[in-house]
């Protein structure tokens, strides 16, 4: 029984390793997705370049250049500037599982489908999420959905709708540009 669980954990980790490798080798990507939480859903996209990202969803845009995070809530006409913790970045970037599954989680195989593997990550004490369920396309190795359960049992479901590989981004793509939003108040919380 213990041996079967060890093999299952190795298979789950191999699937995530392959998915992470495939996504990284895709170069800079733009992923369109639907985010579902209690009370509603929202479509958005994320542009990724290494650890840098810009996330646009539901009236909020978040830029992260690897050090500084800017979060613009359009309705408030305000952008908050922070130096986020690793956990804060993980919560904002739904594809951060590409690195965090290696520490703080126990991986196992879930119930997959004919087209997708299902990997279940169970958070160890102190992990940002209690449970993360990731579906990975068997032929492309790209993630197709991610279901995250917080320590307080709040669920977030992300479905990948599109993925564009080898995008070209300028460094400024991942930084807030005040000229683009001249009427927005900048609140520096660093």
Label each region the model flagged.
Residues 105, 110-190:
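Gly/Pro-enriched, hydrophobic low-complexity segments
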Residues 2, 22-24, 46, 62:
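Generic structural signal for beta-strand residues in well-ordered domains
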Residues 11-13, 49, 162:
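Intrinsically disordered terminal and processing segments
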Residues 2-9:
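Hydrophobic h-region of N-terminal signal peptides that target proteins for export
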Residues 9-28, 34-37, 66-130, 188-190:
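Flexible, processing/modification-adjacent segments and terminal tails
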Residues 27-35, 42-46, 51-55, 130:
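One face of beta-strands
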Residues 43-92, 151, 156-157:
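An acidic-aromatic
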């Amino acid at each position: 029984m213990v041996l079967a669980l060890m093999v299952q954990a190795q298979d789950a980790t191999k699937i995530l390793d392959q998915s992470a490798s495939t996504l990284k080798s895709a170069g800079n990507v733009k992923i369109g997705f639907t985010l579902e939480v209690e009370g509603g859903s929202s479509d958005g996209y994320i542009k990724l370049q290494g650890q840098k990202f810009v996330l646009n969803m539901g009236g909020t845009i978040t830029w992260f250049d690897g050090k500084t995070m800017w979060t613009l809530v359009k309705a408030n006409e305000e952008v908050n500037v922070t130096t986020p913790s690793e956990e804060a970045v993980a919560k904002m970037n739904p594809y951060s599982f590409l690195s965090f599954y290696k520490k703080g989680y126990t991986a196992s195989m879930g119930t997959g489908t004919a087209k997708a593997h299902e990997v279940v990550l169970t958070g160890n004490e102190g992990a940002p999420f209690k449970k993360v369920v990731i579906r990975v396309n068997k032929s492309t190795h790209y993630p197709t959905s991610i279901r995250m359960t917080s320590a307080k049992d709040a669920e977030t479901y992300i479905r990948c709708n599109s993925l564009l590989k080898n995008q070209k981004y300028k460094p400024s793509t991942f930084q807030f540009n005040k000229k683009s939003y001249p009427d927005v108040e900048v609140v520096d919380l660093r």
